[in-house]
Amino acid sequence: MPGNNLSRAEAADRSAHLRIHNYEVTLDVTTGDNTFYSKSKVTFACSKPGYSTFIDAVGKRLISATLNGKSIDSSEFTGQSLFLKDLQAENELVVEVEAIYSKTGEGLQRSVDPVDNEVYLYSQGETAFIRNMYPCFDQPDLKATFDFTVIAPSHWEVISNNPVKNKSVVDGKNKWEFTRTPVMSTYITAVVAGPYAHVHDEYNGKKKIPMGIYCRKSLFQHLDAEEIFNVTKQGFEYFERVFGLAYAFEKYDQIAVVDFNWGAMENAGCVTFREELLVFRSKVTERMYNARANTILHEMAHMWFGNLVTMKWWDDLWLNESFAEWSSYLALVEATRFKNSWAGFNAERKNWAYRQDQLSSTHPIAADMVDIETVKANFDGITYAKGASVLHQLVAHVGRENFISGLQVYFA
């Protein structure tokens, strides 16, 4: 069995034999400062009865596991994976682990606000970190539906990919149950929890989309929600029209999170942002407003390209990211006040790609992603900006109208 470094060959083998139906994920984040309770009930099919494989599961210890009603011995748990023997045509797997909060932004991150000592949680799944939050087959092509339940302190908010179905009080804590998600990859599932301050609006386009913006209570006074909502609405109107397809998910929340390694993350309906990119604590330049709008639109573009349609394996990471990069600049110019954004792309983003291309670590745009560690090394200017530049050239070559028509056929 692998550790955390899943190989392409291992992923392909699982994909050839498994089809995942649904996950019922239960998290209890009231059990301590270092660990939390995590349970996955997974239903899935296997095309080759008798086949053996593994599920990704990272934790301090295995509490219990059953496969089709039979207990799995704890010796089958490595701390990163759980071995599964003799699968049937249809299977039900239940795994409970004592999972570990992340301090590095991978999995379920736990941070403490120094202003008021309040605790804030958020998940980060890309590339293969969601296994740190709940047991799953953590690869992009093994999609499924998800039912999330979270037990949290009574004064907290809890946000996930889908709207809340039911909220109840259990032993002085709140139990949040969310509606079932559409079919999606594990890496874009999300849970965010804590005493977040929030504000809400709605976009009315091809359908009504409830929208929320969340941040730490101590930052809320700095949140310019009107500007963020305005860019978000402009993005929805533009992408729904250009892509020819309504937004596929049920809501759209944007959350500023602390100690974040990335600029933002396109979790379906639950987008997380580095705080300083979304919330400005002081007066900033127009360039910063442009950068924020670009990030908002980049993540929104992923709702179609990446979340709705998804790469089979991380070999196509470049297309996932370069398409969102190209789309965000197109939307900036054609749907927002930032009409000169292509000049910024040429001056900044392409130069980023030029610099990276001159290093000994340069690589083809479409890199050979043999395993997860290789993928991690390729979130760079070549994957994003050089790839977007090539797409921009392609659009110029085939013609914008032809390219957009092809996209609409693809999404349909």
Where are these regions (language model features)?
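Hydrophobic alpha-helical and helix-loop surface patches within well-folded domains
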Residues: F178, I213-A412
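Acidic/His-enriched low-complexity segments
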Residues: M1-E250, F379-G381, A396-V398
